[in-house]
């Protein structure tokens, strides 16, 4: 998501919409680089907004049944939008999941957070102009805890012999406290609170993340998404491609393997609170407890090696 091509196109968009982004930043306190990154990742700066009928997409998903209540509510919200403004009927298109416009709002998000920033009397996130859409994204982040001028996070360098138990999600420290532990490349705000994450375990990059990272996850509840937005936003500042050395020898667990891992952990006394094949906080805590019990690096990462270790324990 954070590619060289997206950076170059974003720089062009930055120049074109610079004055608007400045005004939005002043109004909502959300940095222009972050808004530009969201726009770039969601729709490649408005070039891929989706061509599927929103009503058809939501009706299909509601009928499918896996998240019926959620999509029925979104379908109701979509109908409400059209009831309020029939002018959107010809533009009412988006993704297969029902997300709409330059910044891919769901209908309920539009009703709650869309704003008319250009002053034409209507919050239009579908038009060729991204002004209302970018302001609406800023409005959303502002309402979900975005703190002005606080860095979302940074790539950090861990000291030798680092205690990976400190990367548990419930451990938060100030920047100054992390520096005292030996971390490098942290933001300059010594009082800022944050925690550490290891998206690929102990062998991959480490990140310090702040409350603004959590605000980005309210937009899309995925560490990968929030990291992509954050890294791309940084790239607009440095004008450098956001390239990191990710491990190439680590294969992500399939959903079936994840279910097996969760089942094995629970059977061995480390309750994951269910085996749904989705890696979440309960599974991470169970993994960390297993790793601690077995004198392993406590990075909470669901690797194939961990799954094999669990299987051997059952033999």
Residue ranges and their predicted role:
Residues 3-41, 51-52, 56, 60-73, ...:
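Export/targeting segments at the very N-terminus of extracytoplasmic proteins
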Residues 43-53, 64-68, 84-90, 104, ...:
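Secretory-pathway/luminal and periplasmic proteins that interact with or process carbohydrate-rich
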Residues 47, 60-64, 77-81, 164-315:
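Cell-envelope/ECM-targeting effectors and their regulatory/trafficking segments
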Residues 53-62, 100-116, 137:
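Substrate-binding/active-site groove segments that recognize
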Residues 65-104, 109:
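Phosphate/pyrophosphate-binding betaalpha-module
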Residues 123-177:
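Ligand-binding pocket segment of bilobal, Venus flytrap-like solute-binding proteins
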């Amino acid at each position: 998501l954070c590619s060289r091509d997206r950076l170059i196109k974003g720089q062009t968009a930055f120049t074109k919409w610079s004055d608007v982004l400045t005004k939005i930043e002043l109004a909502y306190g959300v940095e222009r680089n972050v808004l530009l990154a969201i726009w770039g990742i969601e729709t490649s700066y408005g070039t891929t907004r989706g061509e599927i009928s929103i009503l058809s997409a939501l009706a299909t998903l509601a009928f499918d049944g896996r998240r019926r209540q959620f999509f029925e509510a979104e379908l109701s919200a979509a109908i409400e939008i059209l009831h309020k403004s029939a002018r959107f009927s010809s533009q009412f298109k988006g993704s297969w999941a029902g997300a709409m416009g330059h910044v891919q709002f769901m209908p309920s998000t539009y009703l709650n957070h869309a704003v008319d920033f250009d002053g034409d009397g209507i919050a239009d996130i579908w038009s060729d102009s991204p002004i209302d859409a970018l302001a609406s994204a800023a409005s959303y982040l502002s309402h979900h805890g975005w703190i002005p001028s606080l860095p979302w996070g940074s790539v950090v360098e861990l000291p030798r012999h680092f205690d990976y138990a400190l990367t548990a999600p419930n451990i938060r420290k100030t920047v100054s406290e992390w520096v005292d532990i030996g971390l490098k490349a942290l933001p300059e705000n010594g009082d800022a609170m944050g925690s550490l994450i290891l998206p690929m375990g102990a062998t991959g990059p480490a990140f310090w993340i702040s409350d603004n990272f959590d605000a980005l996850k309210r937009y899309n509840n995925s560490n990968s998404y929030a990291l992509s937005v954050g890294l791309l936003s940084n790239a607009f500042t440095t004008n450098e491609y956001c390239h990191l050395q990710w491990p190439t020898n680590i294969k992500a667990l399939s959903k079936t393997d994840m279910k097996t891992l969760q089942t094995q952990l629970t059977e061995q006394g480390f309750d994951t609170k269910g085996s749904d094949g989705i890696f979440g906080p309960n599974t991470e805590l169970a993994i960390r407890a297993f790793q601690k019990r077995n004198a392993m690096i406590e990075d909470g990462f669901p690797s194939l090696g961990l799954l094999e270790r669990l299987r051997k324990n059952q033999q």
